[in-house]
Amino acid sequence: MSQAGAQEAPIKKKRPPVKDEDLKGARGNLTKNQEIKSKTYQVMRECEQAGSAAPSVFSRTRTGTETVFEKPKAGPTKSVFG
């Protein structure tokens, strides 16, 4: 006799091992010629183009050499009053 409220334990399936050659092909296909259609990404891209934000990790214009330790470029200081 089994109880009406008793549940059987779920069977756990093991994933097959991932090969290195499978990963090499998959990494290249993740963002291959696909336009990101997220509203957040659109706003972020507009801010980058306006110059009010640094290039993001997802931006295609990012070179990878940008760091927080870079010194600001020499130029007149911006005033908050005008």
From Swiss-Prot:
Protein's cellular compartments: Nucleus; Cytoplasm; Secreted, Extracellular space
UniProt keyword list: Chondrogenesis, Cytoplasm, Myogenesis, Nucleus, Phosphoprotein, Secreted
GO annotations of cellular component type: cytoplasm; extracellular region; nucleoplasm; nucleus
Main localization, broad class: nucleus
List of residues that carry Phosphoserine: 2
Protein's UniProt keywords contain Cytoplasm: yes
Tissue: Expression in skeletal muscle is reduced during limb unloading but increases during the active recovery phase that follows.
Domain of life: Eukaryota
Placement of sequence motif Nuclear localization signal: 10-18
Stretches for region Disordered: 1-33, 49-82
Disulfide bonds: none
Residues making up the signal peptide according to the UniProt record: none
Record keyword Phosphoprotein present: yes
One example of a Gene Ontology biological process annotation: muscle organ development
InterPro entries: MUSTN1
Family: Belongs to the MUSTN1 family.
Function of the protein: Required for chondrocyte development and proliferation. Plays a role in myoblast differentiation and fusion. Modulates skeletal muscle extracellular matrix composition. Plays a role in skeletal muscle function. Plays a role in glucose homeostasis.
Protein name per Swiss-Prot or TrEMBL: Musculoskeletal embryonic nuclear protein 1
Chain's gene name: MUSTN1
